[in-house]
């Protein structure tokens, strides 16, 4: 994804929204769209079904819930939102690791990183099976239920998977996106710590430690994972109940395959559990560490767990990770987990069927004095940013409701 450099000027002048996370006040235009912050994605299907909103922008798998439940239709996936090509391959979730663990137990950190990379490679090659694994983890392969809305978890995940790009390599364009995100958050006055006045070079040093990724990839290419010294304390991996964290779920559920094929595995202590909460890190047949798997409601909660050393690894979105690092949480971003994976949904009975017709619907409703109300997970979320930028590009203003 290509990010624009002059974010400060854009925000200060309120001429544009900065691409990698900036939320700016939108100047009045002829047509207006209301944005409602729903404090996460969980409430969105019910809000749409009960006509409290006209649509929502969310991460997967919530995008696919609406069409399968018959309450909405997908207007655009995040990579296709306007301006054309601007959001292609936009960054999303990352693997963040506490710096003290990486310094004290680099071998164990490299092994967990390798397990994640191998699981990502596996789910890229086996998307249908991986979708079922995620559905099993999230809902026991049963139904997702939101109030009186019930949909098959397997069907939802099978639709969602093709819209998420599961990747790990911390490329230079990907890093540049994170740096620009820091500039945007700085302009919002949300960064008050180490990132507030840092140069771009300093930002990179503060945010990233890609050595575990490099070491893990090297071991995978060499065909042997190095057995690290045993870790004497229990470790923790924080994660979100989202298909964006599919690599973790696949690594645990397919542990035998990874153990037999590559010599590294996250072996569940109780394989009968749909959602294991304890795993053993196994390298070349040896138990290296016991790891608790800790689900969180949102990224900030996971970063709080990391700050208190309750977890040492986090599968988490980049906005809360950057904010936590700025405040002094001792973590570094090691690699990507996925790109894209969000989408805009509109009510099933709406006249919108794609972005141009959505814009026309918004203009018609605004002219009639009944502006559309679209739910977003939270102010400053990447979904909020993409929606605001797309609306602005189409000549629509935003009002928080």
Can you say where each PLM-predicted feature lies in the sequence?
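Bacterial N-terminal signal peptides that target proteins for export
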Residues: 1-10
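C-terminal motif of bacterial Sec signal peptides marking the signal peptidase cleavage site
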Residues: 19-21
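A conserved helix-loop-strand patch within extracytoplasmic ligand-binding domains
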Residues: 24-53, 60-62, 67-103, 336-401
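Short helix-initiation/N-cap motifs at beta->coil->alpha
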Residues: 32-50, 59-62, 269-304, 317-319, ...
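Paired acidic/hydrophobic, glycine-rich loop segments that form the ligand-binding mouth/hinge
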Residues: 54-59, 73-75, 292-295, 311-317, ...
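Secondary-structure end/capping motifs
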Residues: 103-192
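Conserved C-terminal helix/tail region of periplasmic/extracytoplasmic solute-binding proteins
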Residues: 179-234
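Short, polar/charged alpha-helical segment
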Residues: 241-290, 295, 300-301, 307-308, ...
């Amino acid at each position: 994804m290509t990010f624009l450099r002059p974010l400060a000027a854009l925000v200060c002048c309120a001429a544009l929204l900065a691409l990698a996370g900036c939320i700016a006040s939108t100047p009045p235009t002829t047509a207006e769209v209301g944005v409602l912050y729903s404090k996460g994605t969980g409430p969105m299907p019910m809000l749409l079904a009960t006509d409290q909103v006209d649509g929502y922008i969310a991460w997967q798998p919530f995008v696919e819930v609406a069409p399968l439940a018959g309450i909405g239709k997908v207007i655009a996936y995040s990579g296709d939102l306007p301006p054309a090509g601007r959001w292609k391959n936009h960054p999303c979730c990352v693997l963040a690791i506490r710096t003290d663990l990486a310094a004290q137990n680099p071998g164990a950190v490299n092994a967990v990183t390798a397990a994640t990379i191998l699981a990502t490679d596996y789910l890229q090659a086996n998307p249908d099976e991986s979708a079922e694994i995620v559905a099993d983890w999230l809902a026991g392969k049963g139904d997702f239920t939101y109030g009186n809305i019930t949909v098959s978890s397997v069907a939802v995940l099978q639709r969602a998977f093709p819209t998420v790009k599961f990747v790990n390599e911390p490329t230079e364009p990907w890093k540049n996106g994170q740096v620009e995100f820091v500039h945007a958050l700085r302009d919002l006055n949300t960064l008050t710590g180490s990132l507030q006045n840092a140069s771009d070079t300093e930002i990179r040093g503060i945010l990233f430690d890609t050595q575990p990724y490099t070491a893990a990839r090297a071991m995978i290419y060499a065909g042997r994972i190095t057995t690290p010294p045993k870790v004497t304390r229990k470790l923790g991996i924080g994660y979100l109940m989202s298909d964006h964290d599919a690599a973790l779920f696949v690594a645990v559920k397919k542990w035998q395959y990874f153990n037999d094929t590559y010599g590294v595995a996250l072996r569940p202590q109780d394989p009968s559990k749909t959602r294991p909460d304890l795993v053993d890190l196994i390298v070349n047949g040896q138990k290296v560490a016991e790891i608790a798997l800790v689900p969180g409601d949102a990224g900030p909660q996971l970063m709080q767990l990391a700050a208190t050393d309750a977890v040492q690894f986090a599968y988490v979105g980049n906005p809360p990770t950057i904010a936590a690092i700025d405040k002094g949480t001792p973590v570094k971003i090691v690699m990507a987990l996925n790109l894209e994976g969000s989408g805009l949904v509109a009510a099933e009975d709406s006249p919108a069927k794609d972005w141009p017709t959505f814009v026309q619907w918004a203009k018609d409703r605004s002219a009639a004095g009944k502006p559309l109300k679209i739910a977003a997970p939270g102010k400053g979320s990447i979904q909020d940013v993409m929606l605001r930028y797309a609306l602005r590009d189409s000549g629509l203003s935003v009002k928080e409701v």
